[in-house]
């Protein structure tokens, strides 16, 4: 396990690999970071918290900050794409990803992390914002099966990974079931990604680990230990897509850094947003 970014953050989250770079955010600091393979780094600061980011087909990065979606073309060119008007002040945005059609799926979480006031939402290609799931406390990791027939989803306090049937054309989910219960592991599931074999990689917040889960056998088949207990998210990247980039939170001398680990499987490319 290698520490690749030595600037200590408060809550690094939401890593993506796009444009041959690693992007990630520091949620409470309102920072978007870009780290290239040669170590070159730049950052953009927003006046409010940021939570997720995704690349877009027209170039640049879409960032969820406050109650809006922003397009970052470069560090000096930022514009508001969409603002959620009827915002529930009990919540904030959390993890989000785009599906293969380019829709932006974004979850919300209860600010007190206690009550099921959050949900899962979709910003469609026609810029309509809709709710697809209610009664969520801390909406977190999202990943689609390789055939796009299923959505895997985390509501962290449940300590479970859920599986939904996914309709790619309509952008709808149905038939929720529990894929796996992780209650025997320390911590709660947080961010999540999928590899080229269709298995999930899940960050354990408070558990100091990333778990690899076989979705067919519904069991953990690998565990990567980290020096920091609060592991927040994970993504594949690098020139061969076989490097796992892992973000952590600052509650420990080794927390609040970004780590990497070469693994024996490749990831899949991040879907790009369609707006």
UniProtKB/Swiss-Prot annotation:
InterPro entries: 6-blade_b-propeller_TolB-like, SGL, SMP-30. Gene3D superfamilies: TolB, C-terminal domain (2.120.10.30). GO terms for biological process: L-ascorbic acid biosynthetic process. GO terms for molecular function: calcium ion binding; gluconolactonase activity. Belongs to the SMP-30/CGR1 family. This is Uncharacterized protein Saci_1674. It comes from Sulfolobus acidocaldarius (strain ATCC 33909 / DSM 639 / JCM 8929 / NBRC 15157 / NCIMB 11770).
